[in-house]
C-alpha cells in the first residue's frame, strides 16, 4: 500500500513495465483488484501473480523484481521446509510404533482395543506400579535385594543408615556379592 512518501513517487517513476510470466505488461492498463485482502498482487489470466492497483485506484508500491538469489533463497526455504516435514513425519511414525508396542505389551489390554496415547501411558504406569508392588513385597526374600528397590548409589530406598549397614552386610545384591 502506498504511504505517500517520497520513495513511493520514485518507485512509480522507476517502474515502467510490469512482468507476468515473461510477458511485459503496460503499467497504465487496468489490472484486476483483489477484494478479499490487501495483497499486492492479483492473478493474470493464466493464474500467475501480477502487480495490481489497490481499491483507491492508486498504484501500490511494487516489490523489486525477483532476482535469481531471491528465487534460490525461496527454493532453499522450501527444501528446508520439506526436509523438516519429512523428519517430523518420521518422528511421528517412530512414536506411533512405540506406543503400539507399549500397548501390546500391557497384559490386560485386548489387541483390538483402541487406546489414546494418554490412556496407554496411564495403563503402562499403573502396570509398572503393580510390578513394583509385587517386587516390594518380595524384596528381602532369599537374601537378595532387587535392583528396583535400590537407589543411587545402590542403597536400599527408605532405610535409615543404621538399618542399611545391617541389610547390606546380611544381603547379597543382584549379581556378584557386594563387599
Swiss-Prot record:
Residues 79-131 form the bHLH domain. Keywords: Differentiation, DNA-binding, Nucleus, Transcription, Transcription regulation. At the start of neurulation (stage 13), expressed in the pronephros. At tailbud stage (stage 25-28), expression is high in the anterior-most branchial arch and pronephric glomus. At stage 40, staining persists in the glomus and in the epicardium region of the heart, and at stage 42, expression is higher in the glomus than in the kidney tubule or duct. In adults, expression is highest in the rectum and the spleen, with significant expression in the duodenum, heart, kidney, lungs, pancreas, skin, liver and muscle. The keyword Transcription regulation applies. It is found in: Nucleus. Its main location: nucleus. SMART domains: HLH (SM00353). Residues 34-46, 70-80 have a biased composition (Polar residues). GO terms for cellular component: nucleus. Residues 20-86 are annotated as: Disordered. The keyword Repeat does not apply. GO terms for molecular function: DNA-binding transcription activator activity, RNA polymerase II-specific; DNA-binding transcription factor activity, RNA polymerase II-specific; DNA-binding transcription repressor activity, RNA polymerase II-specific; E-box binding; protein dimerization activity; RNA polymerase II transcription regulatory region sequence-specific DNA binding. SUPFAM superfamilies: HLH, helix-loop-helix DNA-binding domain (SSF47459). GO terms for biological process: branching involved in ureteric bud morphogenesis; branchiomeric skeletal muscle development; bronchiole development; developmental process; diaphragm development; embryonic digestive tract morphogenesis; epithelial cell differentiation; gland development. Residues 50-64 have a biased composition (Basic residues). PANTHER family: BASIC HELIX-LOOP-HELIX TRANSCRIPTION FACTOR, TWIST (PTHR23349), TRANSCRIPTION FACTOR 21 (PTHR23349:SF67). Efficient DNA binding requires dimerization with another bHLH protein. Involved in epithelial-mesenchymal interactions in kidney and lung morphogenesis that include epithelial differentiation and branching morphogenesis. This is Transcription factor 21. The gene is tcf21.
Amino acid at each position: 500500500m502506498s504511504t505517500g512518501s517520497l520513495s513511493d513517487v520514485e518507485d512509480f517513476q522507476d517502474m515502467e513495465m510490469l512482468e507476468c510470466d515473461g510477458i511485459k505488461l503496460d503499467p497504465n492498463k487496468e489490472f484486476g483488484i483483489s477484494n478479499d485482502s490487501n495483497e499486492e498482487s492479483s492473478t493474470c489470466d493464466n493464474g500467475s501473480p501480477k502487480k495490481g492497483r489497490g481499491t483507491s485506484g492508486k498504484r501500490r508500491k511494487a516489490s523489486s523484481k525477483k532476482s535469481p538469489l531471491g528465487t534460490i533463497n525461496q527454493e532453499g526455504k522450501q527444501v528446508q521446509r520439506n526436509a523438516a516435514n519429512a523428519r517430523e513425519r518420521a518422528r511421528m511414525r517412530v512414536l506411533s510404533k512405540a506406543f503400539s508396542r507399549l500397548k501390546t505389551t500391557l497384559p490386560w489390554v485386548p489387541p483390538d482395543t483402541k487406546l489414546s496415547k494418554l490412556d496407554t501411558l496411564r495403563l503402562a504406569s499403573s502396570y509398572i506400579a503393580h510390578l513394583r508392588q509385587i517386587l516390594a513385597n518380595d524384596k528381602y526374600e532369599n537374601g537378595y535385594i532387587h535392583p528396583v528397590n535400590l537407589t543411587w548409589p545402590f542403597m536400599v530406598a527408605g532405610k535409615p543408615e543404621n538399618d542399611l549397614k545391617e541389610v547390606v552386610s546380611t544381603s547379597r545384591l543382584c549379581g556378584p556379592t557386594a563387599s
